[in-house]
Design a protein with these regions (language model features):
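Short catalytic micro-motifs in class I SAM-dependent methyltransferases
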Residues: 144-145
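Class I (Rossmann-like) S-adenosyl-L-methionine-dependent methyltransferase catalytic domain
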Residues: 1-69, 74-80, 84-133, 149-163, ...
Length: 177
């Protein structure tokens, strides 16, 4: 089922795509692919250009996921490629007893997560087997992560998402690999 939860967030900020395309693209991409400080909070040419928590920004997405996947305080959610885990944080604000887990390859991203979710986050690659039981999570989400994988890695990641989740929501912005 094709659903769109995130586009409104992307349209809420201005972006200069042309400026980013005429930059030293190869070197910028190599720096961004490290997924550390420069990607998250460094110059915009490498990634987000300052990915800060804005109270309530992810709340509409969290509400839609909770509603559409029938989540409650007894549910469990895994976020594959959670970054700074702002969506998991907003979900915890709405459902304080929601069991969450999230992983990312970025030490900087995970270190920037809010305290109430940070204990449930760990370093892991989306394309490696997940350390969870079959159907352990009521919902597995992945937003803005999988398009960074090579095709052979993507196949493993999608199989793992299907294996550990009863339901899944995957967002792909683009796929250029």
């Amino acid at each position: 089922k094709l659903v769109n939860y995130v586009t409104a967030l992307h349209q809420a900020t201005s972006r200069s795509y042309i400026d980013r395309m005429v930059d030293d693209k190869v070197n910028c991409m190599l720096k961004a692919k490290e997924y550390e400080f420069d990607y998250w909070d460094g110059n915009r040419r490498y990634g987000y250009g300052g990915y800060k928590y804005i109270a309530g920004r992810w709340k509409p997405v969290a509400e839609l996921l909770i509603k559409n996947y029938n989540l409650n305080n007894d549910s469990s959610v895994l976020d594959v490629g959670c970054g700074k885990a702002f969506l998991l944080y907003e979900m915890k604000l709405l459902l304080p007893h929601l069991k969450i887990s999230g992983f990312d390859i970025s030490k900087h991203g995970l270190a920037s997560a809010k305290k109430i979710v940070s204990k449930d986050l760990f370093i892991h690659r989306a394309q490696n087997p997940y350390p969870f039981k079959d159907k352990q999570f009521d919902l597995v989400i992945s937003l803005g992560c999988l398009h960074n994988l090579e095709i052979f890695e993507l196949k493993v990641a999608l199989k793992e998402i299907e294996r550990v989740g009863k339901q899944g929501y995957v967002m792909l912005e683009s796929y250029r690999n």
